[in-house]
């Protein structure tokens, strides 16, 4: 009988669909990259989600985040993402945590999680996620930097220790090596970062418009990278694709 996953079933078969529907994916960071990871997963058939993000949707998110519209400005990203998931698949199960994940955060992960997505932008949080994933023996894929870039064709999937060019990947290599982490699947760009234009009138440092109640306002960041619609979205969909392929290939 035809259903919303019929076209996908033609590609991966009934068993593949069943694997995706039974899979549980934890996504940390539901922004420019993470929101498209969610989109790719739910439309493919993944039916169980954990979403973690403390942020609220800001006007400046409209240029790249699929959950950002004029109607969702000021709303928690995890709640908007949950609503979108359920609009696509009403049978999905979605746990949300509106919090900023850090080493002292409570344990959210357990052995029911089949895959972890790191799409956060803080090195400390990224490292902690990898460490926890390794301890729990849960597959994880990590997004490296997608800001200050214009060429989505430069993204590659590889191990962290085979990366180059990306400044974030360089820091991650050092920190993971110091912790004895042997491998990490990542999506990164070989494009040299573009230096952002400086415009005091267009600066989040001096003209912050973060929604009321935002805990980590952009005005406190050392640098706010430039971004565009077609770069982080591609990284997110690549990540979704890697997860889906890994899940359906499992014995």
Where is each model-derived feature located?
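Adenine nucleotide-associated cytosolic modules
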Residues: 1-251
